[in-house]
Amino acid sequence: MKSIADARVEVTGELSRIALEYAAVYGRVVPLARQPGFGEDAWAPLEALIAVDEFERVGLHKEVMDWPAYRTALTAFARSGEWEGTFRRVTEVPGLVILELVERLTKGGVVTEINTVSVFEFDVGDKIRHLDIYQQREP
C-alpha cells in the first residue's frame, strides 16, 4: 500500500485525482482540530471540490446529509480524534470514482483500522455531487 500523496502523483484520471485530493484535504484538516479557533471554515479546501447546492452524502447507516450538515459532522469528527489514510486502489469511469482506503481512527488512545470504499459521483463541472461510504472493520 502507498500513501495518498504518492497515489495522487501516480494516478492518471482527473476525477481520481479529485477524489484523492478529497482524502488529502481530510488528512490535512483533521489535525488542525486541536488548534484554538478550529471551526467549519477549515473545510473550505474540501468545499472547493464539492457541488455545494446539490451535494449529498450517504453514510454507513444510509443516513443522508447535505453539504452544511456534512461539514458540521466533519468538524465534530475532527475534534474527536485522529485520522490517517493509506491508499489501496482507485477505479474511474466517466462521472464516477471508487476509492478504496485503509483508514486508521484514533480516539482516546485506541486505534481502529477500517477498510473503506467511497463512491464519488461528479457533476459535469467535475465537482463532487454525491458520496456513498462503505466500511469493513473487525467486530
Regions found by a protein language model. Name each.
Residues 1-14, 72-139:
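A beta-strand edge to alpha-helix "cap/lid" segment located at domain peripheries
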